[in-house]
Every structure is written in C-alpha cells, then in structure tokens.
C-alpha cells in the first residue's frame, strides 16, 4: 500500500479560505483557543477516519472515539509550509505534496503537541534509525507500538492521524542521516515509514482513542451456564429434600403427639377434643384438684349422674361416645364423691 491519495480519499478536506471546511463553529473559536471536537459515529468523517485506522490495524483493537483537532495558529503554520512546497515544485498534484500518516507520542501526552503553537517539534525529537526527525507511519499497527497510554489501568491508547507534507521523498543516504539533505522527507523501507526534517510540515488532524477488544470466550460462557443450571438443579433438589424432611418431621411430630398421654393415662389429643366438645376447661398435666372442672349446666345433668353411678351403669357408659371423657372425670375428685 502506497501513499493515501488525498484527492480520492479525503476530498472533504478541501479548505474554505484558510481553514478546512469540516471545522465546526470556527467563527466562535478565538485565536488562542484549541478545540477538540468529538466526531459523531455514523458521519462520513468518522467512517473515513475509522476505515483508515482499521484497515491497517489488528482487529483485536476497537475505536473508543475520534476527535478532530482545531488549532488555528498550528494550522496556519502548516498551511504556509504547504504553500512554499507547492511554489518549490509548481505542481498541482495534491498527492505529491500531502499524505495522511499515523504518529504515536510514546510517553508524551498528545495534548502537549496539539495545544502548542509549534506542534511536532524536531528540536525535541531523538535520534532514531534514520537520524533525527519526525517519524510517521503508513500503518496504524506500526504507530501502535509507540502509542500513548492514558494510564496502565484504563486500557485506553491514543495516536494521531496526521496531514503530512512529504514532497520529494526518497530512501536515506549517509548524507541525509546527518540532516544535511535537500530532500523534503525520508522514505523508510517499503514506504511504510516517513521521516520529516523540519517543523510545521505535519498537522495533527485527529486524535484516535482506542483499546484492546474484550474477547468473550463462548466455551467459558457455556460452562458457566451449565454450572448455573447444575447449581439450580442442586438447589431445587436440596429444597425438595428439605420439604420432604419437614413433612417427615410433621408426621413424626403428629405421631408423637398422638402417642402422648396425660396424667390419667389417656391420649392427650383425644382428651382435648372431648373437653372442647363439651365446653369443659382442659386440665393441666398436674394431678387434678377438687372442683377444677367447669362443665356447663347442660352437661352437669347429663354426664355427672352417670359418673356417680358408674358401677351400676357400666353398660350405659360403654355405650357413650364420650367414654374416655367419662373415665377421665371418674378419676377426678368429682367422680370419687
């Protein structure tokens, strides 16, 4: 892949008077102000820039946001350099003069570049493989190795997409490495890297923020789903067992209650039911005391005579539905009178 053709790919970059047409609210921007405009996803501008990034970047990365940089003084310096280059070669071919390339700032905050009046400063550059200069890459994947990281924990990385004046660009010679060349820029092997030797020959047009994609492992998700299903099954099974145990306990308690006997030797539940039926106050499990029974008037004449004559009327008592109650009462002090 050679230079990106500005005339075909970035036709929307055509300037209106001095500044690019794409610049927003330029009439509100003061001379000393720098605007960082977030580009809306879905806009033609966003699509063009994102495609330029994605086509030369590993698909393991994704764009977080794209911001357009609007620095008036920085742009004017770049525009003046472009005019001089055009006068030098007297060409109308925009592709010869200008290209779009990526640049990573390493540990330096990109803000130090796009908010300054100089921009990319060759005086602050270090000696690289091709001498001192401003290094730009054709591929985003190359600049990714030199990208700026906001913080180790955020995972956000940043790089510039720049407008670069290449002019007459050729592979380096020993003379050019000493920064004593008449060429406008140096072309690295394969044309994938370009080195500029003077200031104001590159403009940081966009700041691209991106990050590593979060890869979801489907196998892990499936395992987690199966694990959750098994946990639910086990929980349901445990609930079922608990309910069964509760029912068993109820049955056991019921059986225990049914097998409980009072001080008179009779089944407690049955005795209670009989007392309730006849409106009697159920005695405590203590030994009965004289007069603790409180039968109603009707029962006083129906049951008590039978109790006092139980020896003579044993057969009648046996026929009574409430035989157990009669026996209970007969063991009391009332029945012994």
UniProtKB/Swiss-Prot annotation:
It catalyses: L-aspartyl-[protein] + NAD(+) = 4-O-(ADP-D-ribosyl)-L-aspartyl-[protein] + nicotinamide; L-glutamyl-[protein] + NAD(+) = 5-O-(ADP-D-ribosyl)-L-glutamyl-[protein] + nicotinamide; NAD(+) + (ADP-D-ribosyl)n-acceptor = nicotinamide + (ADP-D-ribosyl)n+1-acceptor + H(+). The keyword Magnesium does not apply. Residues 21-231 form the PARP catalytic domain. It is an enzyme of class 2 (transferase). It comes from the Eukaryota. Its EC number is 2.4.2.30. Keywords: Glycosyltransferase, NAD, Transferase. One of its GO terms (molecular function) is NAD+-protein-aspartate ADP-ribosyltransferase activity. InterPro entries: ARTD-AVP, Poly(ADP-ribose)pol_cat_dom. Pfam families: PARP. Residues 218-242 have a biased composition (Low complexity). The keyword Glycosyltransferase applies. This is Probable poly [ADP-ribose] polymerase DDB_G0278045. It comes from Dictyostelium discoideum. The lineage of its organism: Eukaryota, Amoebozoa, Evosea, Eumycetozoa, Dictyostelia.
